[in-house]
């Protein structure tokens, strides 16, 4: 109750945005402090000699970007994503959230075609807002990529901005995954479509680069991509947070000429050790090392000098 009261009065404070802009110019607070210094409004993130605009809703993702720029959120993933975007013509962002990956791709390669998919309607609206304030030509889709076409569902909470929903996962599984009581979740219907169907209906000639962050639904995504995966063989960045997902992806991608790299983010802790190369070549996708992985051909390995 005290925490809620404090948050209520904090939200009433005027001019927080401008105060934090001033603080950021003078010094960088510790993470323990700045994680509490949030506001609502537009801010800019430097991307090379350009800047992109992000609408801050108060999430950790946006706060990290505000205080530390691209070094604050998945820096090694974003760094290689920018390089890959520059080399890619058609880019897909599955589980786009606020659109940071899509925005960076378009900023780095304005001539590229970018498709962003986000099934949660209020997050989709935020995605659209970020695309609009940057005046970017990014095609946004309020649907989920899955293994069938039609309607699916997910269990959502009442948080203004949610960071994870699990398509077609049971209520008990969703509650366990989110670490909340079942009573706090409600069922939401959403349109689902396979990549193969989307490619056919949209006359998509190829996919060069794809980011997939769909909260354990990755195997179903690839089940619906079987027809075109072998033909397109896109470069992939995929979040793997369970061994069974890694094992399934290894089975589906083996024999297609992909190299696997664990993207080692500098956050410390068990899953993301501070020491080590940023992109570590691995032979397996299991073993409890969770985070983002890069999947690419020998040509990409050579061009980016990954080994």
Describe each region flagged by the PLM.
Residues 1-120, 125-193, ...:
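S-adenosyl-L-methionine
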Residues 68-92, 168-232, 244, 248:
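Short internal loop-to-helix segment that lines adenine-nucleotide cofactor pockets
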Residues 96-98, 121, 145-147, 214-216, ...:
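Short, glycine/acidic-enriched loop or turn micro-motifs at the edges of active sites
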Residues 99-102, 124, 148, 218-219, ...:
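Short, well-ordered alpha-helical microsegments
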Residues 105, 127, 154, 221-225, ...:
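Hydrophobic packing residues within well-ordered alpha-helices of enzyme cores
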Residues 117, 195-200, 205-231, 235-237, ...:
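Internal alpha/beta domain cores that form substrate/cofactor-binding pockets in large enzymes
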